[in-house]
Amino acid sequence: MSIKILPQVESIAEEIISIRRDIHQHPELGFEVHRTAEIVANKLNELGMDVQTGIGKTGVVGNLRCGAGPTIALRADMDALPIQETGDCEYKSVNDGVMHACGHDGHTAMLLGAAKVLSGQRDQINGTVRFLFQPAEEGEGGARYMIEDGCLEGVDEAYGIHLWNYQKYGEVGVKEGPILAAADQFQITIKGLGGHGATPQGSVDAVVVSAHLITALQTIVSRNTNPLESTVVSIGMINGGYNFNIIADEIVLKGTARAYTEENRILIKTRMQEIIDGIGQTFGAAIEFDYRDGYPPTINAEAAFEKLLASATKIVGDGAGYPYLSMGGEDFSYYAQKVPGCFFFVGSAPEDQPFRSVPQHCSHFDIDERALLVGSSIFVQLIEDQLMV
C-alpha cells in the first residue's frame, strides 16, 4: 500500500493533530458545541473566508470564493457523545460524562486542515469551496437545520467524511449507491391484564405476548425482505413486570430497524404493524406501536462517487475503494437527498493491528492520528481535481 500525503498537508500535520486533541479534550454535545464552533469560526476568519455562524443553531459555514466555477461543499460534524471517557491519553476529556467517541473531533480537524491548505491556493481555484461544520449529528439531525438555514444554496455537490476504526490506516471505504442505512426506532407497549402467577387463567400475560411478538418480528428479515438486500430489526430493551409471582400487565419493548432502501423501510414498518395487530388480537392484548423515522439511507451519487474515488486513489493507491457498507445511520443523508453527494470512510485503526483497534462509541476510543492527514489530503485533492485551473 502506497500512501502519499500531500506535502502542503504534511507541513501542517502538527497543527491538525493539535486541533483534534484540543477538541477531543473539550467535547460538547448536540447543538451545544459553542466552544468548538468558536474555534472553527476564528480559524476560518483568519484564513480570510466569508464566515457565517449560528447556521443550524450552532453550525459554522465558511465560503472560499474563487471564481465563477462550481460550488462544492465539504462537511464535518462537531458533536460528541454522552460517554465517560476511560482511556488514559494525555488529551482525555475534561468534561465529565462527555467524550469524542466517534471521531467528530478528527472530522473537524481534517476539514480545518483542508481549509487552510486550499485558502493558500485560492488564486488557482475557479469556483467556491463551502466548508460545513455541523452540530448535532448524533441523533438530533443537525443537517436538517443546516439545510433549513440555507447551507446548500447554490451547492453543486457535497462530500462527507468519517474516520473509521473498522478499517486500517491507509484504507478508504467508499461505494456507489447505498453506503449507510436508514436508522429508525420504535417502541411497542403491550397492555394485558395482571393477576396471580398461580392462577394465570384469568389474565392476559404481557410477558407471553412479548415473547411471541419478538419471535414473530424476526420473520420480517428472514421471510419478508429479499435476502440479497440487508435489513435489520432488533429489540434492544424489554421492560416490565413486578415480581416472580405476579402476571405482568404491561411490557415495553424498544428497538431499531435498519434498511438501505426506502422500499424495505416501508415494508418493515408495514409488516411490524400487521404482526402487532395479529398478535394483539390472538392474545387479547392492547398493543400500542410508536414507530419513528430516523435518518434516511445515505446514497452516494454515481458521478460524485467516481470523483471521490479518483482523488482518494491518488492519496492511498489501491487502498481506495474498499466497498464498505454500514448498517449505521448518518444525517449526511439529508445533504445527499438535496444535491449529488458522496460519503466516505477513512481507516483510522493502527495499520499493524487493525483488528485490535477500539471501535467507535467505546469509552476508550482513539484513532491512529496519521489518518487525519489522509482525510485532509483527500479533501484537498478532490478540490484540486475539480476546481483547479
Model-found features: residue ranges?
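Hydrophobic face of alpha-helices
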Residues: 13, 17, 34-41, 111, ...
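Histidine/acidic-residue-rich, glycine-tolerant segments that coordinate divalent metal ions
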Residues: 60-61, 81-83, 88-99, 106, ...
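Non-cysteine beta-strand/loop elements that form the S-adenosyl-L-methionine
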Residues: 73-75, 186, 343-349
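Divalent metal-coordination and catalytic microenvironments
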Residues: 23, 62, 74, 104, ...
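Short beta-strand-to-loop capping motifs
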Residues: 64, 190-192, 257-259
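Metal-dependent amide/peptide-bond hydrolase catalytic core
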Residues: 211-389
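Acidic/His- and Gly-rich active-site-bordering loop/insert found
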Residues: 2-100, 105, 109-125
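General beta-strand structural signal in soluble alpha/beta enzymes
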Residues: 52-54, 76, 131-133, 157-161, ...
